[in-house]
UniProtKB/Swiss-Prot annotation:
Name of this chain's protein: Protein yae1
Keywords: Cytoplasm, Nucleus
Region (deca-GX3 motif) location: 49-89
One cellular component term from this protein's GO annotations in UniProt: cytoplasm
C-alpha cells in the first residue's frame, strides 16, 4: 500500500541537524572567570594572616623565654651585685680612713718645728697602697661581671635549654669572684651585725661587736 503521507509525518529516520551547537569556548581575557578584585583580596588576606601568625607566635615564645630566663638572670645578678657591693664598701672604707689622717709637724726639744713626721704616716701609705690594689680589683670585676662578658660566646650541647646554658656559664664567672672577695665571710659578718641591730639578745650583740672589731678579710 502506497503511503503518500510519509513525507508529511516524517516516518523516515530523523536527519541530523545541519548546524550543530558549538561547545562554549574558553573565556577571553577581557571576560575573566572571576572578578578582578579577588586576587587582590586574596593577597591581602594572606599577608594579614602571615602577620597575625608571627605576632601570636612571637608573643607566645617571648613570654615563655622570659619566664624561663628571668629567674636565672635575677639570681646571677644578685650574686654579682653582692661582689661589687663588697668591693665598693671596702674602697669607701679606705677612703674615709685615709682622709681622716692629719699630718702634724713634729717639734724639737726647743719647740721649733721640723719636717713633717707622723707616727701614722706609714700606716696611711700602706692603706693608700692597699686601696689602689682594691681599686684595680674592683675595675677588673666590673669588666668580668658585665652582662656581655659573662654570657659571651655562649655555646651549649644540642638540645640543652637556653636557661640551663645561661645558668651554667654565669655561675662559672660569678663563683670565681665570690671566692676572691670572700663573700661567705662578709655575709657572716653582716648577719652578725644585723642581729646586733635588731637587739636579738646580749650574746648576739657581743658577737656583732667581735665581728666588727675583726680586721677585714684579705682580698685575693
Amino acid at each position: 500500500m502506497d503511503n503518500s503521507l510519509d513525507d508529511i509525518f516524517g516516518s523516515s529516520p530523523p536527519h541530523e541537524t545541519a548546524h550543530p551547537i558549538a561547545p562554549p569556548s574558553n573565556p577571553s581575557p577581557s571576560n575573566p572567570a572571576e572578578p578582578s578584585e579577588l586576587p587582590s583580596l586574596r593577597r591581602q588576606h594572606v599577608t594579614a594572616g602571615y602577620r597575625d601568625g608571627i605576632s601570636a607566635s612571637k608573643g607566645e615564645h617571648v613570654q615563655a623565654g622570659f619566664d624561663a630566663g628571668f629567674p636565672v638572670g635575677a639570681q646571677l645578678g644578685m650574686r654579682a651585685g653582692t661582689v661589687l657591693g663588697i668591693l665598693e664598701g671596702v674602697l669607701r672604707g679606705y677612703e674615709s680612713r685615709t682622709s681622716s689622717v692629719v699630718k702634724k709637724p713634729a717639734r724639737t726639744a726647743a719647740g721649733g718645728a721640723t719636717k713633717s713626721e707622723n707616727p701614722n704616716e706609714a700606716d696611711a701609705e700602706a692603706r693608700n697602697a692597699k686601696r689602689a690594689e682594691i681599686l684595680t680589683l674592683y675595675q677588673q670585676a666590673l669588666k668580668d661581671l658585665d652582662v656581655q662578658a659573662v654570657f659571651a660566646g655562649l655555646q651549649g650541647a644540642e638540645g640543652e635549654k637556653p636557661e640551663t646554658q645561661l645558668g651554667r656559664k654565669g655561675d662559672v664567672a660569678v663563683s670565681g669572684w665570690e671566692k676572691r672577695v670572700l663573700v661567705a665571710h662578709w655575709e657572716e659578718n653582716m648577719e652578725a651585725l644585723e642581729a646586733k641591730d635588731d637587739g636579738e639578745g646580749e650574746g648576739a650583740a657581743e658577737e656583732g661587736e667581735a665581728s666588727k672589731a675583726a680586721p677585714a678579710p684579705a682580698l685575693s
